[in-house]
Amino acid sequence: MTTEGTISFKQLHFHHPSVALQVNVCYFCQSSLEPPTSSSATCLGCQDSVFLLTPGDKALTLTDTLLLFCIDISASMSITSQVLEGKQPIYRSRLQFVQEAMLQSVRKLSETQPHMRVGLITFNNQVTLHGYDEFTSRFLLGAELIDGEYLKEAAFSFPSPPPLSRTRDCLQREILGLSESGATALGPASLVAIAMASRQPGSKVIICTDGKANTDLGNLEVEGTDARPCLSSTIFYHDLGEYAASQGVTVSVLAIEGTDCRLDELGRLADRTRGKVVIASPHELYTEFEEIIENATIATHCSVTLLLPPTLCVKGEREAGNRVTREVGNVASDTEITFQFGARQHGSQGEVSAPVAGGRVSVQLQLRYRQKDGHSMLRVLTADKEVTDDSSVVLSSLFLAIIQLNSSQASAALAVRGRFQDAKSEGETQRELMERALEYDRSAEDKMIYSKWLKTMDPIHNSLQNYTRRQSICSDTLQVM
């Protein structure tokens, strides 16, 4: 028995009164050798409750979150593409496309969210923190770009931008005045932007670039077609992702189509902070900016703990057993994560047997998170489910959208860790399960959703299959040699 579950975070800000309860034996933590008693066989408490973990803490003053554009203005951003203006073909540089997208975003934000604070950081062979009103721009260059602590202090000492209602005209002038030249100090610029955004949890950084970082700190440009970035740079971007997540900052990366930006490293930075990684054509930059901006962070420092009875165990996680905790970090209203769990194999934990058909099991989720006002919260959701050994009942009641989401997330997680064969097998197993479920009386909508999902996932599964086939051929060749 394998089951998937999904969590939506749309109601994290709701608060329900808690109920004080006392139990003698925890349903989830009881000894594996002790069978559940009548008092512990069912979970006590509310099905959905939210608790304030820090009732004595004073709420933080809520200020509008910060949005920082971190824009590449290196020499390669001068490369042009042909576009039609009416019927007349014209050429625009990559930077011109980025400028146009930013100007559109600023205009819309000034109308819809005039209190939002929007800042601009640009980078080539130096990093520029663009000023506004009476504050002049600050330039970081040379040896300053290899000193991480100095860069953080520079970000902390630079004043936060006032609301967009006051800075719109100045910001538009700064955007229009950009020009391309020099190298790509992406690493230092990312650190400065994240440090500056860390003043207000829930802030966003949007990095837009067309090339690999090629200055000392976070350098991703190395010699040789098969060479990997040096270990220090890999560690740098990993640590940067951890730092951003710990400060409640979401980092998204927009790479311009047709360029090599080493998205494996930058992707991990974005993934750790629940940001987006997008490869966009120059014409689509504004749309991508808007999607990132509109997806507001509603909570930070989120972790999710799944608790199962001893008769069940989690699957596909680093932690074994009937309990797992996953660090989620920043969450938006559309954030969804999934878990897999199933019946424990006989003899794997003392004498615990599989759940008995006709019985019931309870599953609990504990969500810890921090609100924008600084209060730490705990949300507890408990579900009580009947156990059955009738496969037709299970298959006819499966929620296909959850299976599809879990398949995508589980395969992606395996592929990111280099386990391509396991990712391929995971996708095939879930696909077979969905096809079996579709044999039962399913709605036309279910079948259409599955068809669309299949069309999206087929190229990915084919790529995994081709990659694992090449690995197998290379392995066979090495054995022959």
Regions inferred by a protein language model and the residue ranges of each:
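Short, charged loop segments at secondary-structure junctions
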Residues: 124-187, 212-230, 239-240, 247-249, ...
